[in-house]
From Swiss-Prot:
Enzyme Commission number, as recorded: 7.5.2.10
Entry-linked PANTHER family: CARBOHYDRATE TRANSPORT ATP-BINDING PROTEIN MG119-RELATED, XYLOSE IMPORT ATP-BINDING PROTEIN XYLG
Organism: Ralstonia nicotianae (strain ATCC BAA-1114 / GMI1000) (Ralstonia solanacearum)
Keywords annotated in UniProt: ATP-binding, Cell inner membrane, Cell membrane, Membrane, Nucleotide-binding, Plasmid, Repeat, Sugar transport, Translocase, Transport
PROSITE patterns: ABC_TRANSPORTER_2, XYLG
GO cellular component labels: plasma membrane
Membrane listed as a keyword: yes
Leader sequence residues: none
InterPro entries: AAA+_ATPase, ABC_carbohydrate_import_ATPase, ABC_transporter-like_ATP-bd, ABC_transptr_XylG, P-loop_NTPase
Subunit note: The complex is composed of two ATP-binding proteins (XylG), two transmembrane proteins (XylH) and a solute-binding protein (XylF).
Designated name of the protein: Xylose import ATP-binding protein XylG
Membrane topology: Peripheral membrane protein
Places the protein is found: Cell inner membrane
Top-level taxon in the UniProt lineage: Bacteria
Length: 514
């Protein structure tokens, strides 16, 4: 690795309405080095990256930025990109209807004399860039929409390389990727490092940070906590720096008793929304007991989300199932019916299905239980506010006011609010679909504690997760779904990630717990 400093931020201060979002943060990166930037949601990572990438222009912050030893005064994103600094956002910025090549060169087109676009040159160059990323089977003239999220993430990197990126900022790059796609991406980042490209890697997945990063910088509450070689830190050490307190285990151990069967699902079947002849879930049956945490594992696209959506009456296509609650058959054709029978769901995509962005934090929290505060034709705002204040304190939801728009909260705090909303409905069965996706480690712990406490109180938990450590750390029993079928039903005693993956890909026969 080149020992000279490519990029350095010195004592950066950024304030909004007098409140410091960044308070003297420093960061340095060498050519071919990958620096992990860690911190809880709201710590200041996004603000720092906006300063770094030119979103917040020179003059709107205090401190100094050096590029190749000289002051860098970027007044726009284009200025930063011209210097060689490119950010790849968590939400991919590709135009789905345009071709792969058109996306790679969008805003950076190769033209012929006279100004017309040189498609032949762009296609050739796009193929060369993708070959650097081990993609040799891509039709660069085809629309981006023809390719999955794993390919699209690499198209974004190719787009950055087309701009001669020397510093690549990757913001939660694996949040929507499968385990196999993550392996490919991390190995490609290693290739880029060997080629001299520097990276800033932002992720809540600390195992990835440890694996791909050379050094780790932690910020907390807008302050620089420290920078250490990755080899000197274990995951618990990173967490301690991030949250400011020692956490001996991410997964809380709360004594709970598993009781009688509270929900039984028989022959759950879901047909594809666009192809009614294809089944997304095929004849899956299972049960969950009072006080039990049932983990549901499987590869991306296995049908887990479709299955739990059908149990909640929210699957958009055709579905069928026999559902029994406490031994009695119930009809669940809508979320309202499900909630009435004590079945609640915290959805996978909280931004689309979990929150109402324009409403306040408090309004979102009481949305499912508003009838409890009805006094004739009016709402008892005093009683509602008492509930909201109690829950905000209990779950440590960071908000300046319950009236503040929920869209202004970090992902972790939004998720806590969505969870609280459903818990207030007093569920017998609580279904959690990817409950900690995009959530920082401190909020994860709070959510895990809430799940464990709910199980201890007798609530049956069904937890869908793509994070196997989460499944193994929280579950009493694990279902494995593969290609819409039940591939395994395991007691979580001596269970390993390898065994779960083997069942998910059909590498061993269908198994059930003894």
């Amino acid at each position: 690795m080149d020992n000279r400093t490519l990029f350095e931020m010195r004592s950066i201060v950024k304030a909004f309405s007098g409140v410091r979002a960044l308070d003297g943060v420093s960061l340095a990166v060498r050519p071919g080095e990958c620096v992990g930037l860690c911190g809880e949601n709201g710590a200041g990572k996004s603000t720092l990256m906006k300063v770094l990438s030119g979103v917040y222009p020179y003059g709107t912050y205090e401190g100094e930025i050096l590029w190749d030893g000289a002051p860098l005064r970027a007044h726009s994103v284009r200025d930063s990109e011209h210097a060689g600094i490119v950010i790849i956002h968590q939400e991919l910025m590709l135009v789905q209807q345009l071709s792969v090549a058109e996306n790679i060169f969008l805003g950076n087109e190769i033209t012929k004399p006279g100004g017309r676009m040189d498609y032949d040159a762009m296609h050739r160059k796009a193929e060369e860039l993708l070959a650097r990323l081990r993609l040799t089977d891509v039709n660069v003239a085809a629309p981006v929409m023809n390719y999955g999220s794993g390919h699209q993430q690499l198209f974004e990197i190719a787009k950055a390389l087309a701009k001669n990126a020397r510093l690549l900022i990757l913001d939660e790059p694996t949040s929507s990727l499968s385990a196999k796609e993550i392996e490919v991406l991390l190995s490609i980042i290693e290739d880029l490092k060997r080629g001299g490209v520097a990276c800033v890697y932002i992720s809540h997945k600390l195992d990835e940070v440890k694996r791909v990063c050379d050094t780790i910088t932690v910020i907390r509450d807008g302050k620089h906590i420290g920078t250490r070689p990755a080899a000197e830190l274990d995951i618990n050490g990173i967490i301690t720096m991030m949250v400011g307190r020692e956490m001996t285990s991410l997964f809380p151990k709360v004594e709970h008793t598993v009781g009688d069967v509270v929900l039984e699902a028989r022959n759950v079947t879901c047909w594809d929304v666009t192809n009614p002849n294809r089944k997304r879930v095929d004849d899956v049956s299972f049960s969950v007991r009072r006080g039990e945490i049932l983990g549901v594992a499987g590869l991306v696209g296995a049908g887990r989300t479709e299955m739990v959506s059908a149990l909640f009456g929210a699957y958009p296509g055709r579905s069928s199932a026999q559902v029994l609650v406490e031994g009695k058959p119930v009809k669940v054709h809508s979320p309202a019916q499900a909630i009435a029978h004590g079945i609640c769901l915290v959805p996978e995509d909280r931004k689309r299905h979990g929150i109402v962005p324009l409403m306040g934090v408090g309004e979102n929290i009481t949305l499912a239980t508003l009838a409890q505060y009805a006094r004739g034709l009016r709402v008892d705002k005093g009683a509602e506010l008492m509930t909201v204040d109690r829950e905000i304190k209990r779950l440590r939801i960071k908000t300046a006011s319950p009236a503040l728009s929920i869209a202004s909260l970090s992902g972790g705090n939004q998720q806590k609010a969505v969870l609280t909303k459903m818990v207030l409905a007093c569920p017998k069965v609580l279904i959690l679909d990817e409950p900690t996706r995009g959530v920082d480690v401190g909020s994860k712990y709070d959510i895990y504690q809430m799940i464990a406490d709910l199980a201890a109180s007798g609530v049956a938990i069904i937890m869908v997760s793509s994070e196997l450590p989460e499944i193994l750390g929280m579950s009493d029993r694990v279902l494995v779904i593969g290609e819409g079928e039940l591939r395994g039903d395991f007691a979580n005693q001596g269970l390993t990630q390898e065994r779960i993956l083997a069942a998910a890909i059909h590498a061993e026969p269908r198994l059930r717990a003894a």
